[in-house]
Amino acid sequence: MTRPLWDYYVSSSHNTYLIGHQLVGESTIEGYIRALLHSCRSVERKPIHSFLFLTHIVFTAVDIFDGDKEPLVTHGNSFTTKVSLRKACEAIAKYAFVVSPYPVIISAEIHCSIPQQDMIASIMREVFGESLVSAPVKDRPKINHLPSPEELKGRILLKVRFDLCSVTYQANSCE
């Protein structure tokens, strides 16, 4: 577990927050809990392609949209229910390292306004605390390759994809 992270395949799941059908199913934190407790190492889109197969890194997906008060996790353009981003993060924080000490990678697809993006950052900092990777790993001044799973034990990484159309629209409408 000392090679760079990208040298490992990561076992994955899709729409971890959904129970049932992806167009009309229920969104719940139970999917995250189940995945974490069964060593499911999940991703929304594609696994990390490389040489070794690793089953102890969680790669889990979160589709985040504006909520009335705080951001919500739901499947866009569908009739699925919604779950609080805070509750999803709390479930991930509670169960992330019960089965494995290796990193959890959250793949977030952001469809939120700028104010709710700020809330996402605040919620994740508050809930994940020091576990959230927010700077280069200690003693790695320049990133030529990703840290190893060993270096990332007990850490949560965030991989983000923004819906630039909604962000651009939001910025232009604020003028």
Located regions from the model:
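Long, acidic (Asp/Glu-rich), low-complexity accessory segments flanking structured domains
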Residues: 1-42, 49-59, 65-175
